[in-house]
Amino acid sequence: MKSEDVKLGIERAPHRSLLRALGLNTESFQKPFIGIVNSFTEVVPGHIHLRRISEAVKEGINAAGGVGFEFNTIAVCDGIAMNHAGMKYSLPSREIIANTVEIMAMAHAFDGLVFIPNCDKVVPGMLMAACRLNIPSIFVSGGPMLAGRLRKNDQVSCVDLNSVFEAVGQVAKGQMTEEELLELEKVACPGCGSCAGMFTANTMNCLTEALGMALPGNGTIPAVDSRRTQLAKDTGRQILKLIKDNTCPKDIITPDAIYNAFSLDVALGGSTNSVLHVMAVAHEAGADFSLEEINRVSDTTPNLCKLRPSGPYHIENLDQAGGIGSVLKELKPWLKNDARTVSGKTIGQMADAAPKADNKVIRFASNPYSPKGGLAILFGNLAPSGSVVKRSAVAPEMMVHRGPARIFDSEELATKAIMGGKIIPGDVLVIRYEGPKGGPGMREMLTPTSLLAGMGLDKEVALITDGRFSGATRGAAMGHVSPEAAARGPIAALQDGDMINIDIHNYKLSVELSDEEIQKRLANVPAFKPKITSGYLKYYTENVTSASTGAVFKD
């Protein structure tokens, strides 16, 4: 066992003395040492309850004959960080999370790790750490929040955080009063858990099942459900089996597992952020996977779910309909069914054991919402290295669009223009210098897209950015445009009035300019000056790579 580095031999007497100070005894030194990577914090609703999950994990570890050691890492709430300087730190926190786990695991010689994430950057940050360390590891998330209930005119509707973001646009347009907004604000987030729709956090928690790194139910069992506690206990027991068999993350997260994750992703209509994160996980796992391959997956995999923000259902409905296992059951003809999982079963065996889909929340594969999946990677002279769109959340009339560019060099300027009624039907908003380097930190443009949707413009206006979008975004929103403006990508050459062509059906994103004109304009673009020149974001700006490669650090 790796933990023998700190507990065996006379030269380790000082180490054992320190361990005894923690309450361990001689018998404890014969057992595997397991790190429990918690991301509990009182700041994030999705993480406020993770101490309870951790205690259940410890029960499972103890029952199976291990010794658990809990330690923490950071977690950012993207909703609270949204639309101010804090959002510059959200994506960069992913690398910090991976690094802190690496430091703790290597410094203390754990034999295995149980990861307890929940929200957006925590899941991929921990997956990256698991692959980097490559010691037996397993995940159990905190679970999704229940949808809120809003009573209006004797009718009760289900609402969530995205309802509040979009309501701000309705207030700005005079379609909702501030008093009505306050009532919505009070009920939209009723308790602990990751925000209730198929937003980024829940996308990543569901994909963790498809990657093979979590037990069935991880993606959908609600945070407040007693089954979540039982799942945590089972996870604690299972890590001992993984240690015994020396099953490590790189045995599980293979190119086939990445393929399965994207197959599930496009079937669910998951967040565009999943592309960024799964590519980063693949990088750490040494599992090569290209953006073009995502299109091939999406071209042949049906879209089976319309979950918020793309449709009316929440994660609790997905759970009631059979959960991720039932989606995988419908997807079995498209999966790499021999891919391994931490359960000891293959992904195909997990699918076989799941209940049949309900053909409502989870459509039968023979009756999909669309024969093509929910994500698309667009290429063209505006995005030579690619851009990402959630096509399952795009109105049919916006799948092909031609319109004049309206250029904004920051999210704040674009938001001001939208709130001021300066954007008209047909426009293509371009928000640039918001990429990994340019932001820095590749902020999410949820406020602009929510305002457009709340004002009813999401079926008439497109938005293009080298930044990111929230998983709660809907509409014709193309993000991750690469190369970014700060790297002198073509998006930096755009001027107001340039005609932009969007063809999601054919994966095209282009501007009606010749290559010569683009290069001529780029030659006159001033050299990019980093916006932040001190602290962690200075280091991040200097070391982060393109969104097309997952915005990982330089090797």
From Swiss-Prot:
[2Fe-2S] cluster binds at residues 119, 195. One of its GO terms (cellular component) is cytosol. The modification N6-carboxylysine is found at residue 121. Binds 1 [2Fe-2S] cluster per subunit. This cluster acts as a Lewis acid cofactor. InterPro entries: Dihydro-acid_dehy_C, DihydroxyA_deHydtase, DiOHA_6PGluconate_deHydtase_CS, ILV_EDD_C, ILV_EDD_N, IlvD/EDD_N. The active site is at residue 470. It is an enzyme of class 4 (lyase). PANTHER family: D-XYLONATE DEHYDRATASE, D-XYLONATE DEHYDRATASE YAGF-RELATED. Functions in the biosynthesis of branched-chain amino acids. Catalyzes the dehydration of (2R,3R)-2,3-dihydroxy-3-methylpentanoate (2,3-dihydroxy-3-methylvalerate) into 2-oxo-3-methylpentanoate (2-oxo-3-methylvalerate) and of (2R)-2,3-dihydroxy-3-methylbutanoate (2,3-dihydroxyisovalerate) into 2-oxo-3-methylbutanoate (2-oxoisovalerate), the penultimate precursor to L-isoleucine and L-valine, respectively. This is Dihydroxy-acid dehydratase.
